From Swiss-Prot:
Protein name: Small COPII coat GTPase SAR1
Binding site for GTP: 30, 32-35, 129-130, 132, 174-175
GO molecular function, one term: metal ion binding
Topology relative to the membrane: Peripheral membrane protein
Gene3D superfamilies reported for this sequence: P-loop containing nucleotide triphosphate hydrolases
Keywords on record: Cytoplasm, Endoplasmic reticulum, ER-Golgi transport, Golgi apparatus, GTP-binding, Hydrolase, Magnesium, Membrane, Metal-binding, Nucleotide-binding, Protein transport, Transport
Domain of life of the organism encoding this protein: Eukaryota
Species in which this protein is naturally found: Giardia intestinalis (Giardia lamblia)
Free-text activity regulation comment from the record: Small GTPases activation is mediated by guanine exchange factors (GEF), while inactivation through hydrolysis of the bound GTP is stimulated by GTPase activating proteins (GAP).
Assembly and binders: Homodimer; upon association with membrane. Part of the coat protein complex II/COPII, composed of SEC23/24 and SEC13/31 heterodimers, that it helps recruit and assemble on endoplasmic reticulum (ER) membranes at ER exit sites.
Residue segments, region Mediates recruitment to ER membranes: 10-14
Catalytic activity: GTP + H2O = GDP + phosphate + H(+)
EC annotation from Swiss-Prot or TrEMBL: 3.6.5.2
Record-listed GDP binding positions: 30-35, 129-130, 132, 174-175
Amino acid sequence: MGFGDWFKSALSFLGLYKKKATIVFVGLDNAGKSTLLAMLKNSATTTVAPTQQPTSQELVMGSIRFKTFDLGGHEVARQLWEQYVTNSDGIVFLVDSADPSRFEESRRTLQELLDNHDLATTPILILSNKVDIQTAVSMETMVQSFGIQHLLTGKGGSNLRSDQRPLEVFPCSVINRFGYTDGFKWLSKYL
């Protein structure tokens, strides 16, 4: 490690250096991607129209400056995901936990990301959104439905093999403002 890298590490440790990262927000339509980004930017809930084309904005959380891309979740928009996700430092995948009828479609969509060799070590944060709604399934049920229990790497930020992808699920409610902060703290450890 050269002096420049050491200096940046020291400043980052002290919270005086801002890292930059590109984060892509994906998931099926109506999962809460745009609502979450609006909440992070404006600290207020707003009614958000379905995303028709990719949008980008910059956010600062802690010592990290995020360039975010909100990609639509409808079937046609998903065809554009690959050109964004392959250049990202991290992926936030939102799942509507109150709509288990779409779990299979969401699982297949997530599996396409997991199978993409360009993303083999890209951290993926899965936010199981809308857990506050009565019809929401438990996080454990969602994880089992997606068949990813063996891929989860733990919430503690444990040491991973260099070829291992950080992957974890956090329950949240974007509207009620809970759960996603823990997920972003976890993700920031891998950026």
